[in-house]
Amino acid sequence: MATFTDAEIDELFETSGTVIDNIITAQGKSAETVGRSAIPHGKTKALSAAWEKHGSIQPPASQDTPDRQDRSDKQPSTPEQATPHDSPPATSADQPPTQATDEAVDTQLRTGASNSLLLMLDKLSNKSSNAKKGLWSSPQEGNHQRPTQQQGSQPSRGNSQERPQNQVKAAPGNQGTDANTAYHGQWEESQLSAGATPHALRSRQSQDNTLVSADHVQPPVDFVQAMMSMMEAISQRVSKVDYQLDLVLKQTSSIPMMRSEIQQLKTSVAVMEANLGMMKILDPGCANVSSLSDLRAVARSHPVLVSGPGDPSPYVTQGGEMALNKLSQPVPHPSELIKSATACGPDIGVEKDTVRALIMSRPMHPSSSAKLLSKLDAAGSIEEIRKIKRLALNG
């Protein structure tokens, strides 16, 4: 096993401290993020306090090792010595609790600037590991997102497990300086979880393996069911309205036919009114009456039976009898009450009087009515009188 002298050990301490300071103070390209910072919510204040504490501890560290700074200026660091990237990382499970961290602060004051810097990096890695655990255990979007995050973090763990094996093969003699290399692995892990900081190198991992917080994922839509039920109700109402509209259309399809029938009825009623206006109900006993006033005048003339004392001698026969008619009127000659039995037939005179009254009441031209009256006077049979009557009605 190789042995180192005190001077070589001092050189190793000086070189590792210089490399760590160069890494911290290097102005590299900041890690790129898409949309929002990769720093977990609520960790900004803790990180700022840690950097302020580191700034307050840094000056005494530079005062304790002035000779190491001079040696580092004379001897540049070799690639074999500056191999902190292959150091084994310390996981969150290997970190001491809070009381152990307080004891480490006391030892940091005794061991110098390097151990104080590494202890500060240990605290940052603890906070970043706790932030990762909080993201893995938060039930934001269900079980289907957790396997994706765990699968994305498996390649990074595999890389961190391969690095300690390479480091052991390359530098088996770094038994006394295992704290330097181990804690630098934690600093590299904290860089990957903390995101873009003013003095952090760009993460070597791809963005596909970076853990993403699910805080800003859109929540599930709770009102979709209500919208679906509302749409179903609306569709049912629309179907009912459509059915009722079909019924209305069926009823309205018969409206044109009804209109035509109503028009025909109106025409028929008009014709009937015209015919009734041209026709008159004639009194058979008053055929020559053509107006209501004339009919009333005829109705006033009626026989009157005078009772009381009178001279009945003109009506008394030789046998002392008096003949009375149907109206109980005395008849001077009883033979008038006896009528000869003749053949019953239409009375031509009455028919002529009826047709004459009809011709005179019709609104006809005077020449036409005169011709009909002359024909009526010349008619000698019932058939001729009926023909003249038809001509008068047809106008």
Swiss-Prot record:
GO terms for biological process: negative stranded viral RNA transcription. Residues 89-101, 129-180, 203-212 have a biased composition (Polar residues). Residues 29-104, 129-214 are annotated as: Disordered. Gene3D superfamilies: 1.20.5.300. Transmembrane segments: none annotated. It holds the Pfam family Soyouz_module. Residues 222-285 are annotated as: Multimerization. Residues 65-74 have a biased composition (Basic and acidic residues). Disulfide bonds: none annotated. Keywords: Phosphoprotein, Viral RNA replication. Essential cofactor of the RNA polymerase L that plays a central role in the transcription and replication by forming the polymerase complex with RNA polymerase L and recruiting L to the genomic N-RNA template for RNA synthesis. Also plays a central role in the encapsidation of nascent RNA chains by forming the encapsidation complex with the nucleocapsid protein N (N-P complex). Acts as a chaperone for newly synthesized free N protein, so-called N0, allowing encapsidation of nascent RNA chains during replication. Belongs to the rubulavirus/avulavirus P protein family. Homotetramer. Interacts (via multimerization domain) with polymerase L; this interaction forms the polymerase L-P complex. Interacts (via N-terminus) with N0 (via Ncore); this interaction allows P to chaperon N0 to avoid N polymerization before encapsidation. Interacts (via C-terminus) with N-RNA template; this interaction positions the polymerase on the template for both transcription and replication. The N-terminus consists of a long intrinsically disordered tail. The central part contains the coiled-coil multimerization domain (PMD). Forms a four-stranded coiled coil structure. The C-terminus constitutes the alpha-helical domain that binds to the nucleocapsid (N-RNA complex). This is Phosphoprotein. It comes from Newcastle disease virus (strain Beaudette C/45) (NDV). The lineage of its organism: Viruses, Riboviria, Orthornavirae, Negarnaviricota, Haploviricotina.
